[in-house]
Swiss-Prot record:
PANTHER family: ATP PHOSPHORIBOSYLTRANSFERASE, ATP PHOSPHORIBOSYLTRANSFERASE ATP-PRTASE. Belongs to the ATP phosphoribosyltransferase family. Short subfamily. It catalyses: 1-(5-phospho-beta-D-ribosyl)-ATP + diphosphate = 5-phospho-alpha-D-ribose 1-diphosphate + ATP. It holds the Pfam family HisG. The lineage of its organism: Bacteria, Bacillati, Bacillota, Bacilli, Lactobacillales. One of its GO terms (molecular function) is ATP binding. It is an enzyme of class 2 (transferase). One of its GO terms (biological process) is L-histidine biosynthetic process. Catalyzes the condensation of ATP and 5-phosphoribose 1-diphosphate to form N'-(5'-phosphoribosyl)-ATP (PR-ATP). Has a crucial role in the pathway because the rate of histidine biosynthesis seems to be controlled primarily by regulation of HisG enzymatic activity. This is ATP phosphoribosyltransferase. The keyword Signal does not apply. It comes from Lacticaseibacillus paracasei (strain ATCC 334 / BCRC 17002 / CCUG 31169 / CIP 107868 / KCTC 3260 / NRRL B-441). Pathway: Amino-acid biosynthesis; L-histidine biosynthesis; L-histidine from 5-phospho-alpha-D-ribose 1-diphosphate: step 1/9.
Length: 211
């Protein structure tokens, strides 16, 4: 039976394709970097390339059997599918960052800019703080630099962008990596094929992931 997989475009795609190829899946057409978004060249595996926030949408509607997406999206959106495998790629961290003069212990109500309002809200609730969340798409780093927000919650891999913009990390919230998520119904209907894929990827994925 054919498995249909939603793969996150961009950095995740670039990092995961070598793993898929090493697991014996034909990825040449995707690696050719055309403008195609649907790939059905391998009779056993069909792929669609989508933006990260859309992976769970396709998965939840049963359009695809499997989604390959960052755990940041899983944590932010929430999901009702099976998170089956950490691929140990795309490692980065959720962080709280701001300018050097920011005081995280300050008692006044803080303004926090982020692409991840749910995760940010959860973090500050655990800290016992009531904050105002400003959702931003794009360069979140600008928010504390322009005075629009006191701090940001974002993901970082190396911290280079933060350093270049003179921002300091005040807390690490969680680690992030790329995960393989399976539709509940697909796991019942295509159990053998899905577990064969997972076993193949377990053999070729990085065993230890580091930042």
């Amino acid at each position: 039976m054919t498995l249909t997989i939603a793969l996150t475009k961009g950095r995740t795609e670039t990092q995961v394709l070598p793993l898929l190829a090493a697991a014996g899946i034909h990825c040449e057409a995707i690696q050719a970097k055309s403008r195609r978004l649907i790939f059905a060249d391998d009779p056993s595996f069909h792929f669609i390339l989508v933006k990260a926030p859309e992976v769970l949408t396709y998965l939840n509607h049963g359009t695809v059997d499997i989604g390959i997406v960052g755990s940041d999206i899983l944590a932010e959106q929430g999901h009702r599918q099976f998170d089956m495998l950490d691929l140990n790629t795309g490692r980065c961290r959720f962080i709280l960052a701001s300018t050097a003069d920011f005081d995280p212990k300050q008692t006044k109500r803080k303004l926090i800019a982020t692409k991840y309002p749910h995760i940010a809200q959860q973090y500050f609730q655990k800290q016992g703080e009531d904050v105002e969340i400003i959702k931003i798409e794009g360069s979140v780093e600008l928010a504390p630099l322009t005075g629009m927000a006191d701090a940001i919650v974002d993901i970082t891999e190396t911290g280079t962008t933060l350093r270049e913009n003179h921002l300091k990390v005040f807390a690490e919230l969680a680690s992030v990596s790329t995960h393989l998520v399976v539709n509940r119904l697909a796991l019942k209907q295509k159990r053998t094929e899905i577990y064969q894929l997972i076993q193949s990827l377990q053999k070729v994925r990085p065993q230890e992931a580091s930042l």
